[in-house]
Amino acid sequence: MCYAIPGKIESIQEKTVVVDYFGEKRKAHNELEGLSVGDYIYAQGGFAIQKIPLDEAKSILAVWKETFFELQEVDLQLSRLDLNPGAVSGEFLKILDKAAEGRELSRRELLVLIKEKDKTALKLLFKTANFLRQKQHKNSCCVHGIIEISNYCHSACSFCGISGENKNITRYRMSQEEILEAAKVAIQEHGFKTLVLQSGQDCGYSIEELAQIIRQIKTNWPALIFISFGEVGLDNLKILYDAGARGLLLRFETSNPELYQQVNPGKELASRIAHLKKAYELGYLIITGGLIGLPGQSQEDLLNDILLAKELHAEMYSFGPFISHPQTPLANHPSALAETVLKVIALARIIDVVQAKILVTTALETLDPESRREALLSGANSVMLNVTPLKYRPLYNLYPWRAHESES
């Protein structure tokens, strides 16, 4: 649930509240004290995060009421599905028809979809995914703000510009005061209800320091907090959860163990999976996925990546393209194609129709300025906007020419 408008509590049962949005009923987990039926709240990611005064809620809803339904109608028009056969093969159409009905596809059928190259057929695939997105989620779109607090990293990932092996970039580490000020600006001035705190695998912050930052944000401002600090250790996941973090953004990059070791020297896929499983057990919302376009990666690998994300109970799927960075061992490997990323997004929607929120990554927007719109019309329904202080953004140099680097 990602509506950034107030909703009215219809019922409360233990830690679960049912919230009404202009007639739509959605559930949220409640950790706030003193809520009653009839109260108005903001909820994000399935969590109640703030109670707001009645007059303020009604004022906001009065502004949004007409627009809310207008936007739903526009979205409905854009998601209409017409599987016109044209020059597309009969088998491909049968598979899409089965998907549009919400029936589970076999592995063989999914491979037919992901291996398709015909432009007309792919347009139908993307339309089918968008139809399913609208049918299950309407025009709900998650918008998260991300603060990149440090570009220090002791890992040596061969695809990443902030790898510890890259000696040619300027490193930075935001102070606690800077992080809190950035969070304040994002929440109070820009209205974000969900924040992602991200860094490289940085030993410069202790777990106690990170926990203190999270506690202070939660104490001062209403927001759902995701962490993205790499593998912090299984015990430390609980410390950060107890401090108030409720989401984890941690990609497994690839479901292929051999490929994982090739691009993450000295690392094991099993360790990454263990972190994701432990986080889910603790109650974290999971954002995970893979990197598309790695050397030696097959279509079967990509399908396995989507299936692994589902197995790991992903609340949000994050699949982004490999973009070559001149200061990495993979500098000469070609960047992924935007079309391949759109195929993965569409298949993720088809595979996890009901639950999945699917992210449009900044890396995809870097490949193609039109890709945010195309991805949102291909099954995606989530975006992350950079709210890192402008002076630090160019230094978080995961890949060159990153989109939105200078936008305020």
State where each predicted segment sits.
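Auxiliary Fe-S-binding modules of radical SAM enzymes
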Residues: 4-5, 16-27, 35-36, 61, ...
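Conserved hydrophobic positions within beta-strands
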Residues: 7-9
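Structural motif
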Residues: 39-40
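Conserved, mostly hydrophobic/aromatic
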Residues: 102, 129, 157, 250, ...
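N-terminal pre-triad scaffold of radical SAM enzymes
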Residues: 126-166, 171-198
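Catalytic cores of alpha/beta
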Residues: 233-240, 295-309, 366-377
